[in-house]
Amino acid sequence: MAAPSAGSWSTFQHKELMAADRGRRILGVCGMHPHHQETLKKNRVVLAKQLLLSELLEHLLEKDIITLEMRELIQAKVGSFSQNVELLNLLPKRGPQAFDAFCEALRETKQGHLEDMLLTTLSGLQHVLPPLSCDYDLSLPFPVCESCPLYKKLRLSTDTVEHSLDNKDGPVCLQVKPCTPEFYQTHFQLAYRLQSRPRGLALVLSNVHFTGEKELEFRSGGDVDHSTLVTLFKLLGYDVHVLCDQTAQEMQEKLQNFAQLPAHRVTDSCIVALLSHGVEGAIYGVDGKLLQLQEVFQLFDNANCPSLQNKPKMFFIQACRGDETDRGVDQQDGKNHAGSPGCEESDAGKEKLPKMRLPTRSDMICGYACLKGTAAMRNTKRGSWYIEALAQVFSERACDMHVADMLVKVNALIKDREGYAPGTEFHRCKEMSEYCSTLCRHLYLFPGHPPT
């Protein structure tokens, strides 16, 4: 099945909506949702009078909602009212994430009363729109978990909105900052070799449409994750292979075929991303049958994949590892890489050196969207929380940070994120990502080096 293009994911998500409502609800690739545009319009005068821009603009600049040129254009206006009007003119053109980022910036600059005003207006607007067909809920921008049963999902309120901590506009707007020659020269000797062109092969396996007795629901927003990762890995210099909607047996067979590709011999690393429903230790095929993750890792270990021996192998798993929704807890007030320890040595047999041996599994790092026993959260419009955070951090920090440290930053973003869906079990829900590693050196991706 061909991957949906980044420019068509929005149309794909909304094709089942009622015809009378279609014009208002379909998103442009880099356009603001009509609900959000109308919310800003209805509060335009109050915002123009009350916005405090000095710190707010810096937050929006940091989130890539505005550019340096836009900030200068705004500040060139005479008077705070005119400056506020200029910002309000720009915001609707700054992508589907601009509204959420604006609300977050209001909160961060102690203008939460304006955020509350916007969210109240937004909730009222959504009540006015015609209800969706009972068979489809593809337009609802609320968080759902990766193991949420279909009957439960259909009961969710149509006026739910999720705050996003992601600051990008999606795959079309992703840009990876290049590594500088100076950084490469000071770090490459202690890191894994990553110089090949391409850097390696990457596989993105995305299951979205499910059949079988399990009655697993359509992974709305899964196509966004798919497009995001394909774009990200290409920008990082990988040759990307795509698989969509595979049964458990097909996943096993095609992962094995991928692991045995001759190109691994002449490239320096490998990436495997698995996006599906799941349980602890396994992911679902579209037929409702499970593929054990240990079987996946085994396909790429030193015994079964000699072409990748001593080369870093990255795995990213976007799937539930249980069905418990993390409700979170209230926060209380307050707030080397080691060398080998050596091995036992015998005085006998010094004449003949033994062949170097490797542990069966090494040089792997695996990022999980959630902890054991818990559900992974996915926004039905913007995709999974984890993939959003992964794309944000890797695009911004691959230039000067190794993969393990980047995954720590991903953890921090996920930790701070909170579901916003009043009236549902997902309101104020939490998620915590994690990673495990058998890497033996720092893994820098060195994007853009050496220059072509």
Curated annotation (Swiss-Prot):
Annotated Gene3D superfamilies: 3.40.50.1460, Caspase-like (3.30.70.1470), Death Domain, Fas (1.10.533.10)
Result of altering residue 369 to T = Loss of function
User: Consequence of mutating residue 320 to S?
Assistant: Loss of function
Q: Which UniProt keywords apply?
A: Acetylation, Apoptosis, Disease variant, Hydrolase, Intellectual disability, Lissencephaly, Phosphoprotein, Protease, Thiol protease, Zymogen
Pfam families to which the protein is assigned, alphabetical: CARD, Peptidase_C14
Q: Which GO terms describe its cellular component?
A: cytoplasm; cytosol; endopeptidase complex; nucleolus; nucleus
Compositional bias (Basic and acidic residues) spans? 327-336
Posttranslational modification: The mature protease can process its own propeptide, but not that of other caspases.
Region of interest: Disordered: 327-354
Effect seen on changing residue 104 to A = No effect on interaction with CRADD
Domain CARD residues, every copy: 32-121
Propeptide intervals in chain numbering: 2-169, 326-333
The record's top EC class is: hydrolase
Which SMART domains does the UniProt record give? Answer: CARD, CASc
Asked if the record carries the keyword Protease, the reply is yes
Tell me what the record says results from residue 99 to A. Answer: Loss of interaction with CRADD
Tell me its EC number(s), please. Answer: 3.4.22.55
Q: Which GO terms describe its molecular function?
A: cysteine-type endopeptidase activity; enzyme binding; identical protein binding; protein domain specific binding
InterPro entries xref list: CARD, CASP2_CARD, Caspase-like_dom_sf, Caspase_cys_AS, Caspase_his_AS, DEATH-like_dom_sf, Pept_C14, Pept_C14_caspase
Phosphoserine modification sites are 157, 340
On subunit structure and binding partners, the annotation says:
Heterotetramer that consists of two anti-parallel arranged heterodimers, each one formed by a p18 subunit and a p12 subunit. Forms a complex named the PIDDosome with PIDD1 and CRADD. Interacts with NOL3 (via CARD domain); inhibits CASP2 activity in a phosphorylation-dependent manner.
Family, as annotated: Belongs to the peptidase C14A family.
Q: What does this protein do?
A: Is a regulator of the cascade of caspases responsible for apoptosis execution. Might function by either activating some proteins required for cell death or inactivating proteins necessary for cell survival. Associates with PIDD1 and CRADD to form the PIDDosome, a complex that activates CASP2 and triggers apoptosis in response to genotoxic stress.
Instruction: Read off the domain note.
Output: The CARD domain mediates a direct interaction with CRADD.
What is the name of this protein?
Caspase-2
